[in-house]
A protein has these predicted regions:
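A beta-strand signature from Gram-negative outer-membrane beta-barrel systems
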Residues: 231-279
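Extracytoplasmic beta-strand/coil segments of soluble accessory domains associated
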Residues: 174, 178-218
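Short, acidic, small-residue-rich periplasmic hinge/interaction motif at the N-terminus
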Residues: 129-166, 174, 204
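Surface-exposed extracellular loop regions of Gram-negative outer-membrane beta-barrel proteins
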Residues: 506-508, 515-521, 529-576, 596-620, ...
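Membrane-embedded beta-barrel scaffold of Gram-negative outer-membrane proteins
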Residues: 404-420, 541-546, 570-626, 631-635
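Flexible loop and strand-edge segments within Gram-negative outer membrane beta-barrel domains
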Residues: 317-321, 330-343, 349, 354-401, ...
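Gram-negative outer-membrane beta-barrel transporters
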Residues: 451, 456, 493-496, 592-600, ...
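C-terminal beta-signal and adjacent terminal beta-strands/loops
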Residues: 646, 697-704, 712, 723-769
Length: 769
């Protein structure tokens, strides 16, 4: 699949391949050059023309999503004078006809005769080789491997682009993350339900969410609600575990796990004569869900780009669910779950010879009613939450042969207004207002001493302040200074990366006790070895160790009655051993990864939700997590312009409490962490209609550390189906898609007493111009 997200089966350019001419007197030879693949069957490529005798040599394009390092398609025309399977030195090469000097020695008639003879010989070879199909020349198909970052990286990297969203039947951001190995999504159900991500049992607070490379901070809660990001407004989602794959990056991005959300404006600048392009989309789904969106990009030159995007989302979320309790079982509908969201973005990019500047501004507004837990068949609730966020960020990058550097700045403002209209049963104050402001600065530089050794330094500074109408958090702030020193060494098949991080935190709370200040040093090391480097098979072995450190959030420290300034910071130790393999034989390609890990968490902070807005926090002492992550991605081209795409993953997590050996909870699985989980999807792509079947599943879980029958969450599996098609209309493209979610109408819960939606449909239309 192309990294750009285009459908290689349905969206193909029809540019001609013939662009260069070689003149030999009256005989003109066409040289094939790299271009876009043509629709339908491979087109005839006229390569030689001499008078009235025209020799047609057909060149077929072998589409291989693993061939081109830049994400496109490597096009290798067939040359009968080359050995089969031997690639030429460049994508376009002239046929080995007699030298031009030799042709000059012949008269015009002789040259024409030579051309006719060559044409007859090639025509005879053509007819003998193609007895079954007289319209197709036998071709030599060369299959090579494209180097994926995920296969050669020292750390586990999983990435999905917009094409993968279609091929896997993904409908929202939470669904996309649920398809990644090692990820546990805590989902409160419905389009308006909060969705947070825990990776390898470490908790959501250890997962850093970045947008176009810069972190999305929420120091108040310590975790980011991924439901606010519209899947249609993302070009890719990337998960990096253990460490960051690149040597030079903001220090914030060196968290235990990083979810990087990539906007379409982060894609490479276009090199064409179309200065104006954009998209208009509409998504409609069950339970009165509407989601129109639009984006527009103006590119007056190949170095300048300005863009804007906006989307609006509305859903009643009054989906039906089933409560089972013997003869008292009932069919109910979710209440108080309506949600309305509006979001706008502005982007500007300027590129120079060695540098680039990218600036962005965003505003987000969300008003939703918070559905309560279903207790004794009562699911009504009177809570509401209004959230607003505005941020502006700018990032500058510079690079030459020996040096590279970056600098970035970001200002983030957030407002949350929580209301509970039933004051008789409200937990805490019935009206709570929070204002969060953050100033974030980061810079770094890398020196490449040779092709083998590089050294990088980066530093971050952040000032975060929180104010509210509650006495406990009326005015609190934190200053954070992070530094990292990194070194990498490459020699042949071996790659080694070393890092050292310094964390400094200063907490402030005028007139009251503040949380303790902290200074910590944490190391990280990762390595990879290319065990096999053949043409059709590459195998890498990798290993890594890292210590990660995080402070308690403001809610964990200061929230009235539930927060505590005595909470201790978390320190995690991660160990990873992995294997990656990539192979391609003919029409079949495969990418396989397997990673075994062992994590130790000291003084783990566990947030147990009372509802969508109020949390309880405690230190568990020590937690040990052992697990295995397996991923498989394979494609099979079954016919011209048709392929099967299979993607699957499996995760094994044994996350146990090891705090007190005499406690009743010693050795129990952590809350909401399934021991077995996985996902799979199978797509059949054709030029007429593409079909997808997908499933996600998880084993038994518990809502608390006490493993009681009342706290058990049964295992579940959810199936879905999708169909989509694209129409290319000149420079425009129309994409239509239909999804059937939870096709078998299963009733299940991910968070206890928050039922998930049952069978539902989703329709979408996207116009690209």
């Amino acid at each position: 699949m192309r990294e750009t997200g285009e459908n290689p089966v349905q969206s193909r350019c029809c540019k001609p391949f013939l662009t260069a001419w070689y003149h030999f007197g009256h005989c003109e030879l066409h040289q094939p050059r790299e271009g876009g693949p043509c629709k339908g069957k491979p087109e005839n490529l006229p390569l030689a023309r001499a008078g009235n005798a025209i020799v047609a040599l057909h060149a077929r394009i072998r589409f291989n999503p693993l061939t081109n390092p830049r994400g496109g398609v490597q096009r290798i025309p067939f040359n009968p004078l080359y050995e089969a399977g031997t690639p030429p030195s460049c994508p376009g090469f002239p046929l080995l006809f007699p030298k031009k000097t030799f042709m000059k020695l012949l008269s015009f008639k002789a040259r024409r005769a030579v051309a006719v003879v060559i044409g007859l010989v090639l025509g005879a070879m053509y007819a003998a080789a193609q007895k079954l199909d007289p319209d197709t020349l036998r071709t030599a198909e060369v299959t090579t491997l494209r180097k994926h970052e995920s296969i050669s990286a020292n750390v586990p990297v999983q990435r999905m682009d917009s094409m993968a969203f279609k091929q896997r039947g993904i409908t929202d951001t939470g669904d996309a993350l649920r398809r990644l190995a090692g990820v546990t999504v805590r989902d409160y159900g419905g389009a308006g339900g909060m969705k947070t991500v825990s990776v390898r049992g470490l908790g959501a607070a250890h997962t850093m969410v970045t947008y176009d490379g810069l972190g999305m901070s929420d120091v108040r809660n310590g975790q980011t609600d991924l439901q606010r990001f519209n899947i249609d407004a993302l070009a890719a989602i990337e998960l990096q575990t253990l460490d960051y794959a690149r040597l030079l990056c903001p220090v914030r991005n060196l968290a235990a796990a990083v979810v990087n959300l990539v906007s379409p404006f982060e894609q490479p600048l276009r090199s064409g004569k179309q200065p104006l392009h954009g998209t208009v989309s509409l998504r409609q789904a069950a339970f009165n869900t509407w989601n129109p969106a639009a984006s527009l990009t103006v590119q007056p030159s190949e170095r300048t780009q300005v863009g804007a995007a906006a989307n609006w989302f509305y859903a009643d979320n009054n989906y039906p669910f089933y409560v089972e309790n013997g003869v008292a079982s009932e069919h109910l509908r979710r209440a108080n779950s309506r949600m309305q969201t509006a979001q706008t973005e502005l982007h500007a990019r300027q590129r120079w010879t060695h540098s680039q500047l990218h600036a962005a501004a965003s505003f987000y507004h969300n008003h939703r009613r918070l559905p309560g837990p279903v207790v004794l068949y009562v699911n009504d609730n009177n809570e509401q939450l209004t959230e607003q966020q505005a941020f502006g960020q700018a990032r500058w990058t510079w690079q030459n042969k020996a040096w590279s550097a970056f600098a970035a700045a970001k200002y983030d403002w957030q407002k949350s207004h929580y209301t509970h209209h039933n004051t008789a049963i409200a937990v805490g104050a019935p009206r709570q207002k929070y204002y969060q402001r953050e100033v974030y600065l980061t810079a770094g530089m890398q020196r490449n001493f040779s092709h083998h050794i590089a050294l990088a330094y980066a530093t971050d500074y952040a000032h975060t302040a929180l104010s509210s109408n509650l006495p406990a958090t009326k005015r609190v702030s934190r200053d954070t200074w992070l530094q990292s020193l990194s070194a990498s060494w490459h020699a042949g098949p071996v790659s080694l990366t070393l890092r050292g991080l310094c964390h400094l935190y200063a907490n402030h709370r005028p007139g009251a006790e503040a949380a303790d200040n902290e200074v910590r040093l944490t190391p990280a090391v990762s390595a990879s070895v290319r065990a096999v480097g053949q043409r059709h098979l590459r195998v890498f072995l990798r290993a890594g160790y890292k210590e990660a450190f995080r402070m308690p959030s403001f809610t964990e420290n200061y929230y009235h009655h539930l927060g505590s300034t005595d909470l201790k910071p978390e320190l995690t130790r991660q160990t990873n051993l992995g294997l990656t393999a990539q192979t391609a034989y003919g029409p079949w390609q495969m990418l396989l990864t397997a990673d075994a890990y062992y994590n130790q968490v000291e003084q783990r902070i566990v947030s147990i939700p009372y509802n969508l807005f109020v949390w309880r926090t405690v230190n568990l002492g020590e937690v040990r997590v052992g697990g295995l992550d397996l991923t498989l991605h394979t494609t099979l081209r079954v016919a011209p312009r048709q392929q099967l795409v299979l993607t699957t993953n499996y995760s094994l997590q044994r996350a146990a409490d090891r705090s007190v050996s005499t406690a009743a909870t010693y050795g129990n699985q952590l809350p909401y962490t399934p021991r077995h989980s996985g996902a799979a999807s199978l797509a059949w792509e054709t030029p007429w209609l593409s079909l997808v079947a997908h499933t996600t599943w998880a084993s038994e879980r518990w809502s608390t550390l006490e493993h009681l029958p009342a706290t058990s969450l049964p295992r579940y599996s959810e199936w879905g189906f999708a169909a989509y098609r694209s129409w290319q209309l000149g420079r425009h493209r129309l994409d239509l898609r239909a999804d059937l979610v939870n096709a078998f109408n299963r009733s299940y819960e991910i968070v206890r007493r928050y039922p998930m939606p049952r069978r539902a449909y989703k329709l979408s239309a996207v116009w690209t111009f």
